[in-house]
Regions:
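Positively charged, amphipathic and often flexible ligand-engagement surfaces
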Residues: 1-291
């Protein structure tokens, strides 16, 4: 379903902090006051020019520096293609290495996001290489809709591991990704169990209360302490459930994206939530009729 840009913007305002780092700081500070952590992300991906990748690298370092100076409870998320992976693998790895090295200097953390499946191998290789030098300052993301995910967990050596586990949002062929929501959910819990077996720290990224319930059963099964895991949610999604999780004493982190390149991100959120897209369209048309 094609969604016109004005409607995407109308809907997407609730999912992004704004267009500037100042906006991300403001939103993060508000979350911190509610005992909620944040991970800040500069929107943008699929960079094809080295100067643009270097710009994003410097902006990521600026985000980390600002987090440190402002005393925020937040870390950084970034995408490998934003760092130049489409241009050159080693160039992108060097950019990420520089960011993670800076994060180590200020005792912070960088999450290497997972993009569509053609980048999965390189993303995991980046994580494996960076983990050797910065074991406590870098993590990556695994997606339960990918058939390969349990084997990817097995491929990582024991030791300090840090994952975000989510369902996945990119449109992938059936031979690569499960299409049945039930199987995706089952693979989510199966993968989470494997991660806990390896004593990994996991950001359990879901708004599905059934998955949260099953995750809590695994947390109890393994006798995990509150500092051994966290839940993660998107900005602007099911704040009632978010507050329930926090009030129960669990750590929770909200994804706080900002930047000029909000369109692609907002479109993905709409495609992931077609019912919300229809609701946003109705609201938009209602406002148009009454203005």
């Amino acid at each position: 379903m094609y969604i016109p840009s004005p409607i995407v913007y109308f809907f997407g305002k609730g999912y992004i902090a704004g267009q500037t780092l100042y906006d991300a700081v403001r939103v993060t500070r508000e979350l911190n006051k509610k005992n909620i952590m944040a991970t800040i992300d500069i929107l943008g991906e699929a960079v094809t020019k080295k100067e643009e990748a270097i710009f994003f690298k410097n902006e990521c370092i600026k985000v980390l520096s600002t987090i440190d100076k402002e005393g925020l409870n937040a870390n950084l998320s970034l995408k490998p293609t934003q760092m130049g992976l489409e241009i050159d693998r080693d160039f992108a790895l060097n950019n990420i290495n520089e960011i993670v090295s800076f994060a180590k200097d200020i005792n912070n953390f960088v999450r290497i996001d997972m993009e569509d499946s053609k980048w999965t191998d390189n993303t995991l290789l980046f994580y494996k290489e960076l983990r050797e030098e910065f074991p406590g300052n870098v993590g990556t993301v695994l997606q339960s809709y990918l058939r390969r995910t349990p084997k990817d967990i097995d491929s990582l050596s024991d030791g300090l591991l840090n994952f975000r586990l989510c369902k996945g949002i990119y449109n992938e062929p059936r031979k690569i990704a499960y299409k049945d929501p039930y199987i995706i959910n089952q693979n989510f819990i199966y993968s989470l169990d494997k991660m806990f077996q390896k004593r990994a720290y996991v950001g359990i990224a879901t708004h599905d209360e059934k998955l949260i319930f099953e995750s809590l059963r695994l947390i109890e099964k393994y006798g995990l302490k509150k500092e051994d895991y966290e839940f993660q949610m998107l900005l602007g999604v099911d704040e009632e459930l978010r507050d329930i999780i926090v009030s129960a004493g669990h750590r929770l982190r909200v994804y706080v994206p900002f930047g000029q390149k909000w369109l692609a991100y907002s479109r993905r959120r709409l495609k992931e939530n077609p019912n919300i897209a229809k609701h946003a369209l109705r609201q938009f048309l209602h406002l148009q009729r009454h203005t």
